[in-house]
């Protein structure tokens, strides 16, 4: 049977862990009570009380007598063992705050210090739970009211657009707004009268906007004026994210409802913008739907919070009764049940209301469909996945041993064949090997995050029912590696069987083509949600300045900075097959080309450039100067990478000095950011020396070892300036080994980066995502 302390640890919300009942602390206090209580002489107890300590032959008789006396006398005549008083607390400003509970002991326990300490801590835990629950409940209730207003606004907008569409289909000629005439008129030859009319109509539009804002309705980027390519002025009024052209005819409306209706009517009065408006409405609807899902999730977490804490109080009081030999739980639990976090039913009622609203507006009155959105069920771990992981791991090891034997027997690495083999096979197979290693490290990250209760799905904003799990990551990695080694074995067998080199050397290209087809396959096979999510993130990284940067975006950007050798191998592979060098076996066609050599700089710069642009975008959105400082880290890395490439081609003392200077500066920059910013370590004032106050791993030595390991792997670039004289095969293997070390370092870095982000969420009790709403209410926005 699982102990409740472990069950509580497994079920509690990680981000709210500090707000839960400290069950372990109370349990330790009960153990202290048990050890401190010793048998006392009978004279120390009140008349009529029998000691519970010691055994005798008369115990059954005494028990029967106590039972008979309990039935004989009414319970009202029994004195209370304890009394829990409730009072109003006060803040520093003197205002009343939450209710405070305080237990007063009477009779037996008034003389026992350990019992006093226990109930004092129990009161603290009860007050802590109430003080956390009430603000959270208020926050969710206010969020629910805002979402209902947003939904009403959305419904009215949809109705106006629908009515407008019906009028257009029926052939009725609706009156065009002033903004439509502005777009259709030629202002290059406009008269002063036309300009004055424009100004008067514009002022009327501004008056309507001001009137609406005075009554609490705000428009995002209201009354923004711009010019089209033809020089025609245009007014953009945004209620949502749409750039809809606005105008108004007549004076200010008599009421806010009328003004809103007039303004919305004008927003959709242009037939040309019907498609755009519907698209914007759909975008707003998607945001509101996501907000309702997050609200329901938050309410569910708060409900779980209440129930788990109630169970914890019940369990701990039963333990106390067992140790003390008294029935103190009934009195205290009555108070707990009357406290705010249990007695309030607002959360449950709001959950029911959200279910009905979501079913009606977003699921076509299909409750089953609605609950799939509100309560997505995560698929259970399949033993079949574990079986295939083991199967492919065994296949990979067997095929790799076969490959080594065949390579030795065929003499593929002799001086006559090694250049041909390395130029055709090494780049493509290295791509898959590095990718598989990265996937394996990511699987290790997922395993560690799960075991340490780090909520990575919330941090990365993954859907819980489609998020990749560690077994799936291991399956993908072992599948890739088995396929790669199988292709290498087939390549050697066909090469030794007398097939033409041009035919055999197409095998790596075929393998790469299969991988690309699997990646973009539209069918729901082989983890389609994960594949498409990966493609979307890559698109956002490539266009990083133009997209809002989320945690998962810059996390993936950091992964790319560790895969520059993989990108260089892709460059070589692309040139090799596009130039059809596999037919002529002229391997130096690419390497000696000027464009190929210059493209190497671009490939090495791109991951750092994308990451720097993400920092710029985050600085633009958040106005945090730390993002600009972080951008400097990637700029220094770009400089160091470019200097190293040049030094590999221009081997002289000048470039050696530049490599040393640029690499040392970049490494110090990166190490500081790794330890202080990304990991949150090296805090001299921390209670854990040179670490941080909160640690997920219990053994502090892991953090010190990780700091040392990251330091060693960060300076692996020193190999590039040592000028080892090795053969081409050894040189390629050394490059692959260093690239693998960087992938391992990145996987090691990933755990502590996400751990630090998780602890930031814990410190702010952030367990629910805040979805930005489409319609801005000035009063609610503050």
Curated annotation (Swiss-Prot):
Residues 408-423, 495-506, 615-619 are lumenal. Changing residue 15 to K: In pho1-5; disruption of Pi accumulation. InterPro entries: EXS_C, PHO1, PHO1_SPX, SPX_dom. Residues 1-386, 445-473, 528-593, 640-782 are cytoplasmic. The keyword Acyltransferase does not apply. Its main location: Golgi. The chain crosses the membrane at residues 387-407, 424-444, 474-494, 507-527, 594-614, 620-639. Keywords: Endoplasmic reticulum, Golgi apparatus, Membrane, Phosphate transport, Transmembrane, Transmembrane helix, Transport. Induction: Up-regulated by sucrose and Pi deficiency in roots. Down-regulated by auxin, cytokinin and abscisic acid (ABA). Up-regulated in leaves following treatment with ABA. Down-regulated by the transcription factors WRKY6 and WRKY42. GO terms for biological process: cellular response to phosphate starvation; intracellular phosphate ion homeostasis; phosphate ion transport; polyphosphate biosynthetic process. Changing residue 315 to A: In KSC; decreased Pi content and reduced growth. It holds the Pfam family EXS. Changing residue 322 to A: In KSC; decreased Pi content and reduced growth. The EXS domain is essential for Pi efflux out of cells and is necessary for the endomembrane localization. The SPX domain provides a basic binding surface for inositol polyphosphate signaling molecules. Interacts with PHO2. Pi content in shoot of pho1 mutant can be restored to wild-type levels after treatment with cytokinins. Inositol polyphosphate sensor that associates with transcription factors to regulate inorganic phosphate (Pi) starvation responses. Probably acts by binding inositol polyphosphate via its SPX domain. Acts as a Pi exporter, mediating efflux of Pi out of cells. Transfers Pi from the epidermal and cortical cells to the root xylem vessels. Involved in the transfer of Pi from roots to shoots. Involved in abscisic acid (ABA) induction of stomatal closure and ABA repression of stomatal opening. This is Phosphate transporter PHO1. It comes from Arabidopsis thaliana.
